Amino acid sequence: MPSGLIVFDCDGVLTYNHSSWQQLHEYFGSRDNKYFAELYERNLITYLDWMKIDIALMIHSWGKPIKRRDVENALSTIRIKQEAPEVIRALKDADYIVAVVSSGIDILVERVCRELGVDLCLYNKLAFHNDELIPGGEALVPLREKPRIVKNLAESFSISIHDTYYVGDSKWDIEVFRNVGHSIAVKPCGEACGFAEHVVSDLREIIGIVNGSRV
């Protein structure tokens, strides 16, 4: 019987970079147009619409087809936080199921999950045709859908949402914080800091928080 479920966001939580999407925009020379984020936030476009727009902007700015290798190169400089392996190992040794639920990009999130050895990893998938990036993909973790996804994940392991931990860092994580039993925000976390049960500067603090809740 597992001790519980601990779900991590990826960008800015397990990595030093706060947005893999922003990383791609900067690499390919496009503007990360906040206008489309606002349209999504207002429920005027879907997350897949937003993905298509972002990718189209990147391709247009790059001025030539973007290959899978280009995307891999763009994301290769994003590093996993130094303390992350120690924390994930300690949580797994304590019999917690460790999952990542990220609205980031599969090529990065898969690498992070593989290197850290997490139990389950959910993310959005880019679309390639003959190794060429095309607008589209699979929006498996839309930002607004995170509360539902985390709840369903807990239920799949027969773990109460009230016994579930969620670790995030942005305004998009606030609704998840409100729904889980234990919420942890990782600095810098902006307005999300005010909605979490715990706020940490170093991931290693999570070990003490989890151990303390078991006493």
Functional labels for PLM-detected ranges:
Residues V98-S103, H162-S201:
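Acidic, Mg2+-coordinating phosphoryl-transfer loop and its flanking beta/alpha structural elements
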Residues M1-K52, A56:
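Active-site neighborhood of HAD-like aspartate-dependent phosphohydrolases
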Residues H129-G136, C193-V199, G208-S213:
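Short, charged, surface-exposed secondary-structure boundary motifs
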Residues E72-V100, G104-D106:
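Short, acidic loop-to-helix structural element flanking the phosphoryl-transfer center
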Residues L122, H198-E205:
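Short acidic-hydrophobic, aromatic-tinged amphipathic segments that line or gate anion-handling sites
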Residues I53-E83:
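Metal-dependent phosphoesterase signature
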Residues R111-T164, K171:
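Substrate-recognition "cap/lid" segment bordering the active-site pocket of phosphatases
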Residues P85-D93, K146-P147, K151-S158, R178:
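Surface-exposed amphipathic alpha-helices with a cationic face
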